[in-house]
Amino acid sequence: MIDPDREQKKNGGVAEIIRQKTGMHLSPYFPAAKFAWLQENVEEVKQAKRDNDLCLGTIDTWLLFKLTKGEVYATDYSNASRTQLFNIHNLKWDKEICTWFGINADMLPEVCDSSMQYGTTDFEGYFQTPIPICGVIGDSQGALFGQGCIEKGMVKATYGTGSSV
């Protein structure tokens, strides 16, 4: 796994490469560092990785997986772009960055459009007929639509766990 402080001192380039590829500054705030920590410190996670049975994703990925009874392992571009592992230029998981964090890109979910049919759910039998899951979007990104920012030049500031403009 990458040690950002050591790597930065050693060659000064890792943080800049991450910023160029992901648009994000190297920080433990984002999931990449948290995924790396889990793999090094939680025995169940270590074992799942050894067994080639480890899946890593954000809350939307977990919700989709649970709601579809394990049939869908996916995320959307807005959530993938906030992991610090996703190359925003080629719209793929960046294998070089993943390697720095000790992550095999195959552990990460498929990345899809925000607006599409991901699967269906009966919500653990609550619905008699399964209903489609037709969208996934990050909270701050979704807040743009919720607040009516749908025209070029409109701006919104969101304050919560993180802040974004």
Language-model regions: role of each:
Residues 1-32, 139:
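Active-site phosphate-binding/coordination module
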Residues 54-60:
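NAD(P)-dependent dehydrogenases' Rossmann-like dinucleotide-binding region
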Residues 20-28, 51-54, 80-88, 133:
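Flexible, glycine/proline-enriched loop segments at strand-loop-helix junctions
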Residues 18, 41-47:
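Rossmann-like flavin
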Residues 38:
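Class I SAM-dependent methyltransferase SAM-binding "motif I" and its flanking Rossmann-like core
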Residues 72, 76-165:
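ATP-dependent carbohydrate kinase catalytic cores
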